[in-house]
């Protein structure tokens, strides 16, 4: 048994080491391609960034989501899968994060149901049962707009990039029904996410600049424009910002940057909840 335990630990260590090398290997390949065509290599790098490798529904997840009524909406011929649990109180919209799906909210949904809230969850682009081959927060915000026009939520709850997409939607669209916004582990700026990706992959300066150029051509703005902290300053709704001080994915400083601009919001800092921010304390604060 002792030998087996040591062997398994060493195997896990080797697996983690190999996993950490894979991004650098892919980055080196794209850097090499960039020597011949920087435009093509940069486009591939952005496509790689935009394609989730997780977030599909499991059989167990499907069983839970089947307890809600399902409606498929569309944006530019892309399917938007929604799940609805009816209640008599305010309508709450739930937007999950990267490589996740609506089942991520199971615990929160069960708690909100007990309080008789009307609940709407949607699968983001290229996640769960929704359409698209690629994901970005701008497209996600358009999905949220379509869902909001139909179900008229007054409370928005977003996790990670789902929180960012909620703010992009509220800033861009004319939507006056929002009363409360809850942000869980939200990134303050797209540039921070992109810089961490570029560093992880080890991209050259040529590909680095090429990615930024592709983003501006595709979305009409440079990466620096897409900032939760900047875009949130004109939003009047009340808000709660949850962020763990030891979040390994989105730095805690992002929450401080958002709080500084979100005039009607309260920052609730946690310690030990990680990036997922799941637990009784979180849910109880949300439904107060």
Where are these regions (language model features)?
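An N-terminal hydrophobic leader/cap segment in hydrolases
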Residues: 19-72
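Alpha/beta-hydrolase active-site loop
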Residues: 134-153
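Gly/Ala-rich beta-loop-alpha elbow adjacent to hydrolase catalytic centers
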Residues: 158, 162-166
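Short beta-strand/loop motif that positions the catalytic acidic residue
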Residues: 235, 241-243, 247
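Conserved alpha/beta-hydrolase "acid-adjacent" motif
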Residues: 248-254
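Catalytic histidine-centered segment of alpha/beta-hydrolase-like enzymes
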Residues: 273-282
């Amino acid at each position: 048994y002792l030998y087996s335990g040591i062997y398994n630990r060493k195997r896990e260590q080797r697996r983690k080491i190999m996993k950490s090398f894979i991004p650098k290997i892919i980055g080196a390949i794209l850097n090499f391609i960039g020597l011949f065509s920087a435009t093509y290599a940069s486009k591939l790098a952005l496509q790689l960034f935009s394609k989730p490798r997780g977030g599909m529904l499991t059989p167990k997840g499907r069983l839970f989501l089947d307890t809600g009524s399902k409606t498929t909406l569309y944006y530019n011929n892309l399917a938007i899968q929604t799940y609805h649990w009816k209640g008599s109180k305010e309508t709450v919209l739930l937007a999950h994060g990267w490589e996740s799906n609506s089942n991520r909210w199971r615990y929160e949904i069960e708690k909100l149901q007990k309080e008789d809230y009307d609940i709407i969850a949607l699968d983001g682009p290229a996640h769960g049962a929704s359409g698209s081959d690629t994901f970005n927060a701008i497209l996600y915000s358009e999905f949220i707009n379509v869902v909001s026009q139909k179900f008229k939520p007054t409370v928005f709850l977003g996790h990670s990039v789902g929180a960012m997409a909620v703010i992009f939607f509220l800033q861009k669209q004319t939507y006056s029904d929002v009363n409360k916004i809850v942000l869980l582990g939200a990134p303050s700026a797209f540039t921070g996410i992109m810089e961490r990706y570029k560093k992880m992959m080890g991209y050259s300066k040529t590909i680095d600049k090429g990615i930024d150029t592709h983003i501006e051509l595709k979305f009409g703005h440079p990466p620096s424009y897409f900032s939760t902290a900047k875009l949130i300053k004109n939003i009047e709704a009340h808000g709660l910002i949850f962020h763990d001080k030891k979040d390994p994915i989105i730095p805690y400083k992002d929450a401080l940057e958002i709080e500084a601009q979100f005039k009607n919001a309260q920052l609730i800092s946690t310690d030990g909840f990680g990036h997922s921010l799941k637990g009784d304390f979180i849910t109880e604060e949300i439904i107060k």
